[in-house]
């Protein structure tokens, strides 16, 4: 499907922008509270736009989308726990390792073969992620928690590639977002829930809920019915590149030679995958 890789690239762009605007918001609201509000609002928006989707929530959709949403929700929670214990740059790199974990898990679980061209793109993307993110590295509990999140994100990509085809994309997305909200809500219980403290944070919540959550996951769920999980993972690594670009343009961050080289490598890997997929 020629449109699918470009649609996923748009998703990566939305997530990259969300990463930049969330930085200030999660300083003023706990991350789990932010995620709970974001995913709950995203679910409500989807249901309000198309209320008849509730009739499509049969056992098959609930089980498969619920499982995919559980992987996604756990990924966000473990990533958050790790982020509290290690640096943001290292968190970005370790999370991005799902580009390596996705084909490995797909090979082990689904027996999907990965050709040498795709493995080459994976290697290039991984090196690029490292150059973009790493400025010193040590392995501790934070890094291990983030690595678990990368496994969860890889499992989410594989689950969507396995279960999206032949099922209603909208219904699948609603259930996934609900599961993420439910898990984030449970994670918020120990510290209690507090709503966004001001209009600025509410603005970020609304943007991420509508564009980086509801619309983005509809596109991802649809696109993955037409692409292999490994190629999806490589394209989605562009989130890190877009985040860096937006941070430089709008956040006043400085572009280093190392970051530039890393970005070029990730873009190269993504471009090769997209061009091959579009043929």
Where are these regions (language model features)?
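Hydrophobic alpha-helical transmembrane segments of multi-pass membrane transport proteins
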Residues: 9-21, 49, 66-85, 131, ...
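Membrane-interface interhelical linkers
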Residues: 1-10, 43-67, 85, 108-119, ...
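Specific alpha-helical transmembrane segments that line the substrate/conduction pathway
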Residues: 33-44, 80-112, 118, 149, ...
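Alpha-helical transmembrane segments and their helix-entry boundary regions
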Residues: 8, 20, 31-35, 65, ...
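Hydrophobic/aromatic residues within transmembrane alpha-helices
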Residues: 25, 34, 38, 82, ...
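Hydrophobic residues within alpha-helical transmembrane segments
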Residues: 6, 10, 37-41, 67-70, ...
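Hydrophobic transmembrane alpha-helices of multi-pass small-molecule transport proteins
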Residues: 46, 72, 105, 114-133, ...
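Transmembrane alpha-helices of multi-pass small-molecule transport proteins
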Residues: 28-74, 101-105, 152-159, 173-191, ...
